[in-house]
Amino acid sequence: MVRKRMVSTVMSLMMAAAVLTTVPVTNNVKAADKEITSGDYTYVKESNGKTSYAVLTSYKGSETNLVIPEELDGLQVKAISQGFEKNLKIKSIILSKNIAPAKETHRDLEVLNEIETLEEIRVAKDNLSYQAQDGVLYSKDKKQLFSYPKSKKSETYNMPASVKKVEEFNALINLKYLKNLTLSKNLSVTPSCNDSSIESVTIPGQIGGIDESSFENCNKLNKVTITKGLRFINDYAFFECKALKEIKLPEGLQSIGVGVFYRTGIKQLTIPGSVVKIDVIDKSIKLSKPSYLKKFKRDSGAIYYEARATIKASGKKAVTYKASRITKIKAKTSKVTIQKGKTTKLQTRVYISKKLKKGYLDSEILKFTTSNKKVVKVSSKGTIKGLKKGKATVTVKLRTTGKTYKVNVKVK
């Protein structure tokens, strides 16, 4: 269903298989060929070429609050592998000081995200690589989020602003009790949160985009708050979010991927005047969109929209280009003088792939604003009118990229 989840599952199976083989995990770390039982644990012996250590593969005891041992049979326990998720009694895990990062053991802690009953993770204070806060596992510097327990009872999670990366092994997938999620402003894209109980999510504008399938099948999600700054929404981001009935897309958004709002409760959608492309979208959604977004059909029959820029030259047929090819816009003249009560139309020169074209850019892809509405009025088509004596500056912006130029207007 979700490509990223499928990849993660395949990787998990490959890792589990690697535990039972003699094939090197990398060219530095080698695994033993059999599991060893020590009390309630099973483990394999691995070596980084200098020292040997234990990698736990299962726990068969009945403890609900599990303390990972520092050593087994004289070997430091440095990692945990697949197998722990089969024990449905574990509610809390305390990682010892010896649990090491993947760069040292080439073993991540993905298994923590597979334990359905896990409510809390704690870490020994003298562990050099990890720390936990409120039951959530982070890197020692708190820049990476590794695991949010599947059965953690808290309804609200405000991700620390220090977090720059969420590890891509199901850290926020299939959460049972979380309702309100606020993401860190320092993430580059949203993490995978699909199949979770989330009802509300806040996405700070500093985040570049919403990644593929990020909230897929979050069927209780009914409120999405996105602040200005988001640039893209990738394929199937909100697929199967059936409770989502409305969403306000921010200015500055540039692209919307395939099936982003498929099978949601959204019936109407307003597209901001910065979007350059909408890939395949649910036909049942009524769009309110900028006129420069033109409708096209693929060979498969699927409908998509793409920004087009029209250049008109006197005595010649209008020519249309992909708006993405516009590299610069400039004024025909940067200074205009008009009489009070009179009007004139601003004209915009345009560079396509860095080459200046003859003619002027159609105003439908431009936005016009005035610095003084009492002196100069400007229409959506670029017609200015002098209202009273004075000066004003009209700013002309290319909607799709934000490129601008200014015209100084004097009214006599």
Regions found by a protein language model. Give the residues of each.
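Bacterial N-terminal signal peptides that target proteins for export
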Residues: 1-13
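Bacterial N-terminal signal peptides
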Residues: 12-22
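Sec-dependent signal peptide cleavage junction
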Residues: 20-34
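Extracellular/luminal ectodomains and secreted, surface-exposed scaffolds of diverse proteins
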Residues: 39-45, 49, 129-130, 366-368, ...
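Structural signature of tandem-repeat unit edges
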Residues: 40, 44-47, 61-78, 87-104, ...
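Core beta-strand segments of extracellular beta-sandwich domains
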Residues: 81-84, 192, 345-350
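Consensus positions within tandem repeat domains that build extended binding/scaffold surfaces
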Residues: 169-170, 211-214, 235-237, 257-260
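Extracytoplasmic soluble-region selector
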Residues: 250, 322-412
